[in-house]
């Protein structure tokens, strides 16, 4: 915990709320949580891994906004039990609950042991429906473009600099007085953005697709919370098999060329070709350097080049895929991030579901080695898994 006086050079006019208002009369409530999420950049949200915490809750309605700090390391914090009791009442209302990147906040709300009633609106998802060609979907960018409002970050960044912390990932280390105004502003902007998006939904006749995405959301949330079951013993066995395969193929190469090449370095494979009197490989147009594609190595008549390709496959599966899987396993499960639509953290323009942390689209196909990797994913007890392949075509103009 950072030890530092609260009375530094940076001043704040934010005042901590002195009451818990009854919001039951409001039809729309905007919510933004500030969190301590230490592994966010490397493993995704910590909400499913029993680390981190919600440090503050910002709520906004038509004529009021407030930020309730409960776990800032530098304080001051309000009574956690009282705040969560009030927040629970807010969530139990039938009003629309409006978020930007809703699944992130909803996961942390679940972590608090609270339940959300009413329809959940995600302005980041709506932004993608309104304009799928945007480059950025973060709250600041979208709000600036649609309502001319942006985050109030100047005081926060100045305070973070004085305290020697990252203004985003280490916000929880700052005193609440430097975060309160920023957090309230986020909730207010999200609410205002939703008012503008309602106009866009009407003008573009997007009601059906917006409603569809809202209906899908609870299922995606449950999928994220439940996670995918992993057989960790099988993962270790597959990892060992891949290592043995890699060693076997590299030994074969060494026996034929008398050295271990760097299988991902074209210059090193070129030396193998020199030893084997192979000259039919391509060179890049710009630099003239050798190029060794997977297709070239896999289908070459020379067994050494085919062995290099096989070694590459084993190496990639082990170091790129399995190591990534191991990094995300928690209590025998992987809780990958699921993306409904294109957004700042991943996703596709077409609306096809995609994953990150880890990227489950990287699961190998139905080769022998690929099926070995797929075997680490196991169904729930009493459930059978059916493997289906859907043939489809994406038409472009």
Predicted regions and their residues:
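Conserved beta-strand -> loop -> alpha-helix junction used to position metal-binding or nucleic-acid-contacting
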Residues: 115-132, 138-141
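Conserved "right-hand" nucleotidyltransferase catalytic core of DNA-directed polymerases
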Residues: 1-71, 134, 144-147, 155-373, ...
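Short glycine-/polar-rich loops that comprise or flank the Walker A/P-loop
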Residues: 93-95, 118-119, 382-383
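Acidic beta-strand-to-loop metal/phosphate-binding motif
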Residues: 30, 95-102, 387
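Phosphate- and divalent-cation-binding pockets in alpha/beta enzyme and binding domains
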Residues: 104-111, 271-272
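Nucleic-acid-processing active sites and adjacent nucleic-acid-binding tracks
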Residues: 62-97, 228
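Alpha-helical scaffold elements adjacent to nucleotide-binding pockets in ATP/GTP-utilizing enzyme cores
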Residues: 105-108, 138-142
